[in-house]
């Protein structure tokens, strides 16, 4: 199934390129930065800090990871990727001194590899529901730790994924852990995959998760340190 996805994604490259230029003409895409969607950047990765990559597609998803940015930006380089110009504008307006922002590369193996070769993240955190199979699988192949935070799956998407549940499990088994934002999301995800799924609550709607946020950030520090130790032992 995944091989078919890869083939189809390559077939669609001409349409993706054409659509990108159309979006530029309509001012829906950033003319000066559209190459980032193809894994190309003008920015150099800082050499003195390990990098945490957080993917938050939209502004709403971006707000869910505010506590991660504030907890980690001093010690780690924080790379935020989004897919919309609105989210990019929001990120640069509110967090320009704390993060590096890039547009997420299109989910084509060639462009994903370019992106990963440049940034070499230590940890990747996916926010909510914007999952890209090629990217996620490439992270697994490179043994880069990934977490799915504030995870959700709508009833409509759940019905669609039920027909491809084995593929959903193939994708999500790349995650070290999944944290669902509601009990309904938890049950839907558990129906589709055997990956470790925990109930968290919606980080955008409540501040009652302060204890989780504290323990979660500490767990991330431990995971990064553990990954570093494993690399040294190799």
Each language-model region and where it sits:
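Active-site and donor-binding regions of nucleotide-sugar-utilizing enzymes
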Residues: 20-39, 45-212, 228
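Charged active-site motifs of nucleotide-sugar-dependent glycosyltransferases
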Residues: 47-52, 217-223, 232-234
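N-terminal start-of-domain structural block
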Residues: 1-7, 225-228, 233-234
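Membrane-interacting alpha-helical segments
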Residues: 1, 5-8, 12-19
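Alpha-helical scaffold segments in soluble metabolic enzymes
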Residues: 10, 188, 234
């Amino acid at each position: 199934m995944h091989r078919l996805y890869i083939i189809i994604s390559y077939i669609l490259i001409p349409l993706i390129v054409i659509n990108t230029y159309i979006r530029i003409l309509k001012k829906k895409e950033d003319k000066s930065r559209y190459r980032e969607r193809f894994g190309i950047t003008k920015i150099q990765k800082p050499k003195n800090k390990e990098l945490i990559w957080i993917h938050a597609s939209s502004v709403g998803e971006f707000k869910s990871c505010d506590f991660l940015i504030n907890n980690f930006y001093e010690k780690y380089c924080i790379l935020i990727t989004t897919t919309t110009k609105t989210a990019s504008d929001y990120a640069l307006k509110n967090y320009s001194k704390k993060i590096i922002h890039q547009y997420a590369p299109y989910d084509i193996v060639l462009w994903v590899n370019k992106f990963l070769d440049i940034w070499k993240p230590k940890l990747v955190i996916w926010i909510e529901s914007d999952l890209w199979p090629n990217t996620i699988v490439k992270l697994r192949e490179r043994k880069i730790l990934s977490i799915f935070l504030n995870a959700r799956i709508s009833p409509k998407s759940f019905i669609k994924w039920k027909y491809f549940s084995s593929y959903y499990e193939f994708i999500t088994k790349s995650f070290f852990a999944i944290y669902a934002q509601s009990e309904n999301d938890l049950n839907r995800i558990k129906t589709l995959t055997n990956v470790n799924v925990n109930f968290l609550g919606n980080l955008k709607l409540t501040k009652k998760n302060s204890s989780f946020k504290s323990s979660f950030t500490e767990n991330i520090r431990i995971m990064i340190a553990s990954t570093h130790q494993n690399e040294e032992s190799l």
